[in-house]
UniProtKB/Swiss-Prot annotation:
Keywords: Cytoplasmic vesicle, Hydrogen ion transport, Ion transport, Membrane, Phosphoprotein, Synapse, Transmembrane, Transmembrane helix, Transport. It comes from Mus musculus (Mouse). Predominantly expressed in neurons in the cortex and in the dentate gyrus, CA1 and CA3 regions of the hippocampus (at protein level). Expressed at lower levels in astrocytes, oligodendrocytes and microglia (at protein level). In the cerebellum, present in Purkinje and granule cells (at protein level). It comes from the Eukaryota. GO terms for cellular component: clathrin-coated vesicle membrane; cytoplasm; cytosol; Golgi apparatus; melanosome; nuclear speck; perinuclear region of cytoplasm; plasma membrane. Subunit of the V0 complex of vacuolar(H+)-ATPase (V-ATPase), a multisubunit enzyme composed of a peripheral complex (V1) that hydrolyzes ATP and a membrane integral complex (V0) that translocates protons. V-ATPase is responsible for the acidification of various organelles, such as lysosomes, endosomes, the trans-Golgi network, and secretory granules, including synaptic vesicles. In certain cell types, can be exported to the plasma membrane, where it is involved in the acidification of the extracellular environment. Required for assembly and activity of the vacuolar ATPase. Residues 1-395, 434-448, 563-580, 667-726, 812-839 are cytoplasmic. It is a multi-pass membrane protein. It is found in: Cytoplasmic vesicle, Clathrin-coated vesicle membrane; Cytoplasmic vesicle, Secretory vesicle, Synaptic vesicle membrane; Melanosome. This is V-type proton ATPase 116 kDa subunit a 1.
Length: 839
């Protein structure tokens, strides 16, 4: 099996990096993205590592850049993204970057502070302008109110606002007032509070400000209203001011005479004009600063986060006692060792160091990470497999087979020619525009997820077209491409049909045994005549049910066969002789035999003998019961009873074959090894004497948690494990075969939903023969298209997708795929280059 079908061969290597070259070497390795660093300081606190100060400086620069980015986005300035991949700055360049970011941050903060103060002043002047504009009307109304209060007829009603001695003298009444501005939504509550606290002894007038005013702190526009409150006495004045303060109303001085108000308004307008000019200049300066930053901020982000990633990686390394060398351990693919060596040489040259960096391969029994190379086409399918579990190192990778089997099984459930075309067109659109979509960096998580599976959707659509043609199903209707192979005419000429037969029967059955009625199989797929047959569902159910069983058993047998390649590669002959062979015999003797029976029945019985065809279900049940009644179900072939009894006995013998032999042989081997004293020690291979290379290797003691240390053999545990595996496999063969019937069930459900949608929606519009019907068809078709996309494409498509996922994860992969590995996570700048800064 080639590398396509297995994970890459990995090796553990030791890097010796000179202190002055370590930064540049790690930078080159990050650009290459082919090595995974191991933490050699697991017991050291992150705040006590050597490069923690550099990491903090990078985080501080990152914070400043995020502040600048926030200001840029707030100003709606587009951030330029040229796709440039800047080189990592040298450590000495960090000071210049820090100074630059500090300058930009301080400048923006100063501008924001000044702008906020100016806007607050501008808001106050604007509110004062509206107060002066509205007060004349308020004062006129107050004067009228005052005259009414002085009227003897109204004297008793207004007594609460008049002092007793003034009432006696009839002296003129002087009212105090306050004017201000308040948020419009607070006016009703404000008015009720004034009325209750002041007991109705105040006169409130308010008017809305037509244009919303900008809040200097938040930048939001707020609707406000001008108010003026008339009262008498200092006690009411204090109450009114406290209420205004509680409602966060802004109070402003307002002259009493019209002349003074006019002069003040003139001065306010002049100050507003001057302030507006200063505000415009401040905003222009802020825009220039932000636009200049927007051109470079993406590059700055990449530089800073590359530096941070490098220093974080350097913190994983050990430092020798001389402080002149950093020691790192990395997992890397064997095929990429040359490119890694070249990257180290390049990094050493960039740093100006004269001492080369050294890469030394190490021998270890630790389990390496699993690394499957993918491209943009296979990446989605590999993600489907990895979602179940990361493959064990070097075991068979299901992804290459999933590329075909997953969309095919999806299409078996989804098969519809029309729906397949719609799905394919959507996928083709995403594939053709993938460069533009990738450059736009969509933040919509749902669309990003769909886009990442564009090639999966493309194949699902293409296979749906294929299965739709086989089912001859296009939006629940059949396509009569080649003409039906069935003919009615021979039923009149050679059969016993007459005109009276047609008139007297609502349903008639064509007899394929009569020559000429059935002209042979349809060239491709199902004959379109079945679309109008009353027994269409009976025929399709039988066909799809048997097809589901056949596909399921073939799929599972293929999975069991793949386990053979794992056993051969890992040199486990016991698993072949006492695992693979009995498993394949068990499944083939029972369910493989069922597939043979299905094909045999299809070929052995024709139109003349189909009435005598026995039931496969009854035969299969009788096979397990060893029951063969002479009356009822006839035998399919001669010698059937003996063959079926033989197959059952063989299948039953496979159970102890799988259950007992392997644990007993392992126990015998263990006792023999124990007797000879040839057990392995530790996790590192030990020979007669360490070579020079081995002596260097044994110095490191940071063993991974994934190491496969030799353990004491426990016969009981082995026996229990083998019993669980045997029971799971034997019962799984039955349950998994039944599970594949979901192919039939979902295909039936999809076809029926499609037919219901056609009958209940589009059929109505097509049967109205008038101008109104033509106009109505436009809206009916819109509803039909919407329901087709929402229900049949999205909901049914998602359902079929999940069921296909289940069939691969459980029914297929559990035959050969353990999925207990851990993923290869190389140190790479790729996610930084793509703008995924938060990862």
């Amino acid at each position: 099996m080639g590398e396509l079908f297995r994970s890459e061969e990995m090796t553990l290597a030791q890097l010796f990096l000179q202190s002055e070259a370590a930064y540049c070497c790690v930078s080159e390795l990050g650009e290459l993205g082919k090595v995974q660093f191991r933490d050699l300081n697991p017991d050291v606190n992150v705040f006590q590592r050597k490069f923690v100060n550099e990491v903090r400086r990078c985080e501080e620069m990152d914070r400043k850049l995020r502040f600048v980015e926030k200001e840029i986005r707030k100003a709606n300035i587009p951030i330029m993204d040229t796709g440039e991949n800047p080189e990592v700055p040298f450590p000495r360049d960090m000071i210049d970057l820090e100074a630059n970011f500090e300058k930009i941050e301080n400048e923006l903060k100063e501008i924001n502070t000044n702008q906020e103060a100016l806007k607050r002043n501008f808001l106050e002047l604007t509110e004062l302008k509206f107060i002066l504009r509205k007060t004349q009307q308020f004062f006129d109304e107050a004067e009228l109110h005052h005259q009414q209060m002085a009227d003897p007829d109204l004297l008793e009603e207004s007594s609460s606002l008049l002092e007793p001695n003034e009432m006696g003298r009839g002296a003129p009444l002087r009212l105090g007032f306050v004017a201000g501005v308040i948020n419009r939504e607070r006016i009703p509550t404000f008015e009720r509070m004034l009325w209750r606290v002041c007991r109705g002894n105040v006169f409130l007038r308010q008017a809305e400000i037509e244009n919303p005013l900008e809040d200097p702190v938040t930048g939001d526009y707020v609707h406000k209203s001008v108010f003026i409150i008339f009262f008498q006495g200092d006690q009411l004045k204090n109450r009114v001011k406290k209420i205004c303060e509680g409602f966060r109303a802004s109070l402003y001085p307002c002259p009493e005479t019209p002349q003074e108000r006019k002069e003040m308004a003139s001065g306010v307008n002049t100050r507003i004009d001057d302030l507006q000019m200063v505000l415009n200049q401040t905003e222009d300066h802020r825009q220039r600063v932000l636009q200049a930053a927007a051109k470079n901020i993406r590059v700055w982000f990449i530089k800073v986060r590359k530096m941070k990633a490098i220093y974080h990686t350097l913190n994983l390394c050990n430092i020798d006692v001389t402080q002149k060398c950093l020691i790192a351990e990395v997992w890397c693919p064997v095929t990429d060792l040359d490119s890694i060596q070249f990257a180290l040489r390049r990094g050493t040259e960039h740093s100006g160091s004269t001492v080369p960096s050294i890469l030394n391969r190490m021998q270890t029994n630790q389990t390496p990470p699993t690394y499957n190379k993918t491209n943009k086409f296979t990446h989605g399918f590999q993600n489907i497999v990895d979602a179940y579990g990361i493959g064990t190192y070097r075991e068979i990778n299901p992804a290459p087979y999933t590329v075909i089997t997953f969309p095919f099984l999806f299409a078996v459930m989804f098969g519809d020619f029309g729906h397949g075309i719609l799905m394919t067109l959507f996928a083709v659109w995403m594939v053709l525009r993938e460069s533009r979509i990738l450059s736009q960096k969509h933040e919509n998580e749902m669309f990003s997820m769909v886009f990442s599976g564009r090639y999966i959707i493309l194949l699902m659509g293409l296979f749906s077209i294929y299965t739709g043609l086989i089912y001859n199903d296009c939006f629940s209707k059949s396509l009569n491409i080649f003409g039906s192979s069935w003919s009615v005419r021979p039923m009149f000429t050679q059969g016993n049909w007459t005109e009276e037969t047609l008139l007297g029967s609502s349903v008639l059955q064509l007899n394929p045994a009569i020559p000429g009625v059935f002209g042979g199989p349809y060239p491709f797929g199902i004959d379109p005549i079945w679309n109008i047959a009353t027994n269409k569902l009976t025929f399709l159910n039988s066909f799809k049910m048997k097809m589901s069983v056949i596909l399921g058993i073939i799929h599972m047998l293929f999975g069991v066969s793949l386990s053979l390649f794992n056993h051969i590669y890992f040199k486990k002959p016991l698993n072949i002789y006492f695992g693979f062979i009995p498993e394949i015999i068990f499944m083939s003797s029972l369910f493989g035999y069922l597939v043979i029976l299905i094909f045999y029945k299809w070929t052995a019985y024709d139109a003349h003998s189909s009435r005598n065809a026995p039931s496969l279900l009854i035969h299969f049940i009788n096979m397990f019961l060893f029951s063969y009644p002479e009356s009822g179900n006839a035998m399919l072939y001669s010698g059937q009873k003996g063959i079926q009894c033989f197959l059952i006995v063989v299948a039953m013998l496979c159970v102890p074959w799988m259950l007992l032999f392997k644990p007993l042989i392992l126990r015998h081997q263990y006792l023999r090894k124990k007797h000879l004293g040839t057990l392995n020690f530790g996790g590192i291979r030990v020979g007669n004497g360490p070579t020079e290379e081995d002596a260097e290797i044994i110095q490191h003691d940071q063993l991974s948690t994934h190491s496969e240390d030799a353990e004491e053999f426990d016969f009981g545990d082995t026996m229990v494990h083998q019993a669980i595996h045997t029971i799971e496999y034997c019962l799984g063969c039955i349950s998994n075969t039944a599970s594949y019937l979901r192919l039939w069930a979902l295909s039936l459900a999809h076809a029926q939903l499609s037919e219901v949608l056609w009958t209940m929606v589009i059929h109505i519009g097509l049967h109205v023969r008038s101008l109104a019907g033509g106009l109505g068809l436009f809206f009916i078709f819109a509803a039909f298209a919407t329901l087709t996309v929402a229900i049949l494409l999205i909901m049914e498509g998602l359902s079929a997708f999940l069921h296909a996922l289940r069939l691969h994860w459980v029914e297929f992969q559990n035959k050969f795929y353990t999925g207990t590995g851990f993923k290869f996570l190389p140190f790479s700048f790729e996610h930084i280059r793509e703008g995924k800064f938060d990862e």
